[in-house]
Regions:
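Catalytic machinery of carbohydrate-active enzymes
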Residues: 1-335
Length: 335
């Protein structure tokens, strides 16, 4: 289905960190295709700082929480904006409810049936059940309204953020190590990270530990285990400050988590570590910076990081030597 006249369009992508970042190519395509259109984005409060002030977004609609009361309150705001089209890039009940509350006459979503999201859509013909990258699925929403697919080089808005965090030591040749993930099976053990940090230090890099508040204890353990100095930024950066750090890094090493996708978005050379998640679906096929995938899981396409089999290959099974070799292959020389 192609739309002949796109005037006011709303993206609904409420969460999470990585999912919001992976929706940026859709935003870029919509703005390039419909330069005079009003583009809005509905996002959960926790992730709004990623998008606040973005030049391609005319209206940022912030959902305080996913409870029904805040959803209905946001609906008042969305109806006042008079959107013609809503693209539900989340595909869940709350995002579909937000789309419905906008009163937009055209509400386009995926062909899956999750949490009864389809009952609020006017069109659920966008294919999302095949084994392709999540960015590809999101871009299909843009296809449905005639948006062009443009090469995604980087998000210059996020890449322009300064590295404003206070760091001691040499800032050159920073190796950003994203030490956290939503579940332990998706990342390296603290001992493995400490070994990687020491090997990078010996190779002329300054290791920087990246993570949120939930990774603070893990980062402190890595720092204690490492034989050489590291810069510990866990729980010390906002989203925009993190963008600045990743933009200025010589290389990023990360498992499948939000910061991995942010590194891709700002054009940082990245080594992606996969095991219980599928790089076909969540790796990098959308950015243009150097990216090496190290996949302990082989060709398996039925991975479930929430229910990991006892014999499953996990990220911690990736040899340190392979990670370091990948780093040296793609790291850029910083001035």
């Amino acid at each position: 289905m192609l739309v002949s006249n796109v005037n006011r369009i709303l993206i609904v992508k409420l969460s999470s960190f990585g999912d919001v970042v992976q929706t940026l190519p859709l935003l870029h395509g919509l703005r390039a295709s419909f330069p005079s259109a009003t583009i809005g984005w509905a996002v959960q409060k926790s992730f709004a700082p990623l998008l606040h002030g973005h030049p391609y977004i005319d209206n940022l609609h912030v959902l305080d929480s996913k409870k029904l009361g805040p959803c209905f309150k946001l609906g008042d705001e969305l109806r006042a904006a008079k959107y013609d089209i809503v693209l539900d890039a989340q595909g869940l009940f709350v995002s579909a409810l937000v789309a419905r509350l906008s009163n937009a006459p055209m509400r386009i979503g995926y062909n899956w049936r999750r949490e009864a999201n389809n009952i609020f859509m006017t069109d659920t013909s966008v294919i999302a059940t095949d084994r392709v990258h999540m960015v590809e699925k999101i871009l299909r929403l843009g296809d449905s309204v005639g948006a062009s697919r443009i090469p995604f080089l980087m998000d210059t808005f996020l890449a322009s953020k300064p590295m404003s965090v206070d760091m001691t030591g040499d800032r050159k040749q920073l190796a950003a190590l994203v030490v956290g993930a939503s579940v332990a099976s998706k990342t390296l053990s603290p001992e493995h990270w400490a070994r990687i940090a020491d090997m990078l230090f010996s190779g002329g890099f300054t290791p920087v530990l990246i993570g949120g508040p939930q990774e603070q204890a893990v980062a402190e353990k890595i720092e204690a285990l490492a034989s050489n100095p590291v810069i510990n930024l866990a729980a010390k950066t906002s989203f925009t400050e993190l963008a600045g750090v990743l933009t200025n890094a010589a290389v990023v090493v990360s498992s499948d988590t939000g910061a991995l996708h942010l590194a891709v978005a700002v054009g940082a050379p990245t080594v992606g570590l996969f095991g219980v998640t599928d790089p076909v679906r969540t790796g990098n096929n959308w950015g243009h910076a150097p990216f090496i995938t190290l996949d302990a899981g082989g060709l398996a396409d039925n991975r479930n990081f929430r229910d990991v089999a006892a014999d499953a290959k996990v990220v911690d099974d990736i040899p340190s030597s392979e990670i370091i070799a990948a780093v040296h292959k793609i790291a850029r020389r910083m001035p």
